[in-house]
Amino acid sequence: LEKDKENRLLARGPSKRLTGEMIRNNALESSGLLNRTIGGESVKPYQPEGLWRVNNATYEQDTGDKLYRRSMYTIWKRSVPHPTIATFDAPSRSVCTIRRQETNTPLQALVLMNDPTYIEAARVLGMKMLAFPNQKEAIATTFRLLTGKVILPRELDILLALQKEEHNKFQKNIDKTKGWINTGEFKLNSSDDIALVAANAVVASTIMNSDVTITKR
């Protein structure tokens, strides 16, 4: 590990994008939200309101720790599959599938930027970044949590500039700030600087949406 932290000296196979379930689990685990309970009934995490009405059914979203269970416990309706996981090529389960199709579409990036699960995970990471003595250490640690890799100097410089730019914007636009910090059930500490948390969350979201996070190499 000391000689090859990035695992570049030993080839282990071709690059492969993580499945939708893995990407969601990684976001929850990295932010510390993941509920590790094993077994039990299916759960109903965040999904767009009214999606089940097409079949005259009602989707009652769960609350608390149930929102953060592993993706394998997400309730599955074959006629209306969970949109977040389906966007990342999860099969419909109406027929047997030997191998998943793997696509790369703009919708996948939009999911990672706008789905409440990922915004909430980014916001929690943004809150945790406040505990570090400086932004460099906060961003480097968050990058490591999400990607399992050591951040490069040029990557760190880009994210530092992004954090500074977003912080300035959030300080001037409190409504935009509230849009970030109020997404999801996890509560913000009342003493936290909401503009700083939101700016940190944008950085975490950017890392979460990067190829290095969602692709295994």
Where in the sequence are the language-model features?
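An acidic, gly/pro-interrupted, aromatic-rich
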Residues: L1-E137, F186-R217
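C-terminal structured "cap/appendage" subdomains that terminate the fold
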Residues: L130-N200
